Amino acid sequence: MAELKNDRYLRALLKQPVDRTPVWMMRQAGRYLPEYKATRAEAGDFMSLCKNQDLACEVTLQPLRRYDLDAAILFSDILTIPDAMGLGLYFETGEGPRFQRPTDTIDAIKKLSIPDPEDELGYVMRAVSTIRRELKGEVPLIGFSGSPWTLATYMVEGGSSKTFEKIKKMAYEEPATLHMLLDKLADSVILYLNAQVANGAQSLMIFDSWGGALSHHAYREFSLRYMQKIVDGLTRHADGRQVPVTLFTKGGGLWLESMAETGCDALGLDWTVDIGDARRRVGHKVALQGNMDPSVLYASPERIHQEVDQILSSYGEGTGHVFNLGHGIHQHVDPEHAGAFINSVHELSAKYHK
């Protein structure tokens, strides 16, 4: 493997000194880029794009050709694990992901097998190794998975949901059934993420997109408990380096202290949290990633610059901050505005690292 030329992102996650705040964007390979749209059209559909290692590599690298980013993230989907379990993932136009066979009964859950990451998910591993090779050591590669709770919401609901009625009914009516599903998913995620590291991922991120839908107590029981199991089971060293792990619960601002206790290296923050306050609460234990509202990218470059300045100022001096959005970049954002965001982080952050 090529020697890593820019390790700013990995160093910040491990709270080691950096010359400026590293920056990348969730969904940086995505529909806001015309070159992404062209490659997706070539693939035919979204999952065909994910399953073609060369095209998945191409879209992963596209934002790095445009912008001076400090990390690349594997182009894939959080629903690869349930798809590999045989649920029949498909995408409805305007509806998002759906499953032909929802997992909403104990019998369906008992029948689920844990996918072999090198077999049923081999296409993801081939993409990871291809991307790592083609990066040529320019920046680190982030691997990722959805959290067990978030994956379970899609599996039990049969797709996206605004109310989470079916899975919450299961949580309160048949908690043992839901725990069986979450346990299988946690085991699957551990294998999946460790295989990504074995194939070249240099950092890992767990996306708990729907953890914020849970109550205070239920979050600990149905989401955090299983992310803890995953953190305990992950490969944390490879290629002579630490492999940092970031947990991101959207809507999880209430639970930062509990998340920091898991032994992860960093927490992702959504835009509802003040990053300075988060640093005071948990900055002695973990690095922080975030957390500009993606909608700010609709504003003028001058306004974007101001928002970046405000977040950097709130975090303050020293390492332990990876600048990012508070969630994925929106598809209708002007790519020039994304560039203004990245350039603002470069321009404004150096003074915080003297």
Curated annotation (Swiss-Prot):
Native source species: Shewanella woodyi (strain ATCC 51908 / MS32)
PANTHER family hit by this protein: METHYLTETRAHYDROFOLATE:HOMOCYSTEINE METHYLTRANSFERASE RELATED, UROPORPHYRINOGEN DECARBOXYLASE
Superkingdom classification of source: Bacteria
Keywords: Cytoplasm, Decarboxylase, Lyase, Porphyrin biosynthesis
Function summary: Catalyzes the decarboxylation of four acetate groups of uroporphyrinogen-III to yield coproporphyrinogen-III.
One BP term from GO: protoporphyrinogen IX biosynthetic process from glutamate
Protein name according to UniProt: Uroporphyrinogen decarboxylase
Enzyme kind, highest EC tier: lyase
Primary site of residence: cytoplasm
EC number(s) from the headed UniProt entry: 4.1.1.37
PROSITE patterns assigned: UROD_1, UROD_2
Molecular function (Gene Ontology), one example: uroporphyrinogen decarboxylase activity
Pfam families for this protein: URO-D
Entry binding sites for substrate: 27-31, 77, 154, 209, 327
Subunit structure: Homodimer.
Originating gene: hemE
Record-linked CDD domains: URO-D
Catalytic activities: uroporphyrinogen III + 4 H(+) = coproporphyrinogen III + 4 CO2
